[in-house]
Amino acid sequence: MDVKIIWHGHACFSIEGKKNVLIDPFLTGNPMAKVKAEDLNPDIILVTHGHYDHAADAVSISKRTGAPVLSVFELSEIFKESGINTIDINPGGTVEFEGVSIKATIATHSSSYDGRYAGNPVGYVIDIGRKIYHAGDTGYFKDMELIGSVDRPEISLLPIGGHYTMDVDGAVEALKMLKSPIAIPMHYNTFDVIKADPLRFKNLAAAVGTYVIVPKVEEPVEL
């Protein structure tokens, strides 16, 4: 099945196939964003953790569209206070949503929402006709080998900006374990502290057998 991936900057993506899946909606306050939160009409919203640069527009988009917000239990309980439709999950769990399979994985990071503890961060493996792994904010970790061998994502969306997540070299180490044939970098160059060169990532990844696509913001990647 044809799938379209659109990078909205930072870690925010739309994945369009059987359904329109929006991940980590950070448009408001995102210096890379070329669209506004009100321009997006997802069927479901996935949030990897509660930090503002990943969850900023989740509530407003959900209220406007009725799309449920999927996140870990603790963050989901916070979202419920806004009166939106929520779905909770935890690492290892899988949610089936109207023909789309969404599995939560671990991630090595932290999570809070407006200063409140928001559970553990996660990544997601999304089966929407193609298997796509959004790692969330994370460093590389040994269990990526299991994600690679068990879930077998065809496309991995990986942070490369360093400081708060793995950097370019770390993302290449992740690819050695994931063995995805295609990768797309994220979480870089939004702010000075996460400056990174995606072309360096592309070149290093090629040496471990992964083709890296470096899209421009709002430039669709069709697979």
Swiss-Prot record:
Top-level taxon of the source organism: Archaea
Key words of the record: Hydrolase
Alphabetized SMART domains for the sequence: Lactamase_B (SM00849)
InterPro entries assigned to the protein according to its UniProt record, in alphabetical order: Metallo-B-lactamas (IPR001279), RibonucZ/Hydroxyglut_hydro (IPR036866), UPF0173 (IPR022877), UPF0173_UPF0282_UlaG_hydrolase (IPR050114)
GO molecular function, one term: hydrolase activity
Parts forming coiled coils: none
Cystines in this chain: none
Family: Belongs to the UPF0173 family.
Name listed for the protein in its UniProt record: UPF0173 metal-dependent hydrolase TV0864
Organism: Thermoplasma volcanium (strain ATCC 51530 / DSM 4299 / JCM 9571 / NBRC 15438 / GSS1)
